């Protein structure tokens, strides 16, 4: 008797959620790719730990506020992903250095198949995370990285997909 073929895994497109203007282009591109190939979008938000804590209670309060802010931002972007893909995104909230947390997440979550980042087109560099990945992190990243220029419109991105 022949073995049943294993169902191919759904590609997962990871977008780092931050306050940059170009994050929108990365999210738009990832949603378009997910829609066109039957994949999913994953969102990662990294909470930067407080530099110093005066008292344990103050530090805990700061951590709770940062978590609430992260969850609020993720909810907004998750709704956008649902609207564009008709699918629920995978959500990751991490705490620590964004570079380490990103690479650790990609290494741990084997369903992630592509990292999508938006590039700052208004300054000399594409952004600190892209600069890090191109200089040091690419050798540690097990998935391809797509860099989307931050000056593209939604219509231009949709035309590419």
Residue spans of the language-model regions?
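Short, well-ordered secondary-structure micro-motifs
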Residues: 26, 53-56, 103-104, 127-128, ...
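Small/aliphatic-rich secondary-structure junction motif
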Residues: 3-57, 140
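Acidic, proline/glycine-rich short linear motifs
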Residues: 45-72, 155-161
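A short helix-to-beta-strand connector/capping loop
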Residues: 84-90
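Gly/Ser-rich helix-loop-strand patches that form or flank binding pockets
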Residues: 1-3, 106-161
């Amino acid at each position: 008797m022949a073995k049943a073929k294993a169902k191919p895994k759904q590609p997962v497109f990871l977008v780092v959620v931050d306050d940059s203007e170009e994050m929108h282009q990365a999210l738009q591109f990832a949603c378009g790719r997910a829609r066109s190939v039957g994949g999913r979008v994953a969102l990662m938000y990294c909470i930067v730990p407080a530099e110093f804590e005066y008292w344990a209670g103050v530090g805990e309060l700061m951590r709770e506020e940062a978590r609430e802010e992260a969850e609020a931002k993720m909810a907004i972007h998750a709704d956008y992903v649902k609207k564009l893909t008709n699918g629920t995104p995978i959500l990751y909230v991490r705490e620590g250095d964004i570079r380490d947390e990103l690479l650790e997440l990609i290494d741990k979550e084997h369903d992630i198949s592509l990292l999508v980042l938006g590039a700052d087109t208004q300054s000399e560099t594409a952004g600190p995370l892209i600069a890090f990945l191109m200089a040091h992190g690419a050798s540690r990243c097990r998935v391809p990285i797509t860099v989307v220029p931050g000056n593209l419109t939604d219509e231009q991105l949709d035309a590419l997909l």
